[in-house]
Amino acid sequence: SKGLVGSEMCIRDSTAIHNPTEGVTYQLGNLTTINSKYKIMTVCDFRTQDIAMGGQGAPLVPVGDSILFSKFTACLNLGGFANISRKKNKKVIAYDICSVNIVLNYLSMKKRIKYDKNGLIASSGKIITSLLNELNSLEFYKLNHPKSLGVEWVSDVIFPILENFLIKYPLESVMHTYVIHIVNVISLSLSPSDKILVTGGGAHNKYLIKKLKLKTEARIILPSNEIINFKEAIIFALLGLLKVLNINNCF
């Protein structure tokens, strides 16, 4: 904010290209330019380094989750993509589950609306069984973790499927079915004993959260709006601090 002065800056890069299976990711934001402009220590481009070391480059939050939110058995982020991090056998595992807001917002824009507030559009539709079956059977869901998703996968795989069904079915029903698909896939990563912290823009989607609570026996916990909206920013600030302190910031 205006007048705020810091000694270090951490940039959460925007991903332009992400294909970890080919060892490729590209983040918007140039370290040298940013550092020259603001004249302070700058940390950025986390994903490139992670992939260079054999990782997926996403998700990058499990370190922060394990430090700041350790009282939860797992942390579920509902952003452009759903990703989860949890402790398993004294290790932290994290992976992308499915595409969420990147798809729901794409469908909302067809009605000239930026996003489906509270899931009102989706809640007015009906299930399309054939679409749900096709989505649920996608190859990505059969892969073992670690695994991650990028916009390229959504453009090449998800959007063509949805466009095909939009020819024959109302948008409301396509969106409704996609929400059910999201819930189905996420529930496979949860167990009845889980205490799940849910954050990200999708946590504000009341219809999505309602369906998720009905689908799983796990305890779904929504924190304050500040944590829902800014948890990822807080964690990236922590990752930057760990880098400055020369402490491992990647599992």
Model segments located where?
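Active-site metal-binding loops of divalent metal-dependent hydrolases
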Residues: T15, G80, G201-H204
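Glycine-rich phosphate-binding loops at beta-strand->alpha-helix junctions
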Residues: V24, K195-L212
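Glycine-rich phosphate-binding/hydrolytic loop that grips phosphoryl groups
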Residues: P223-F251
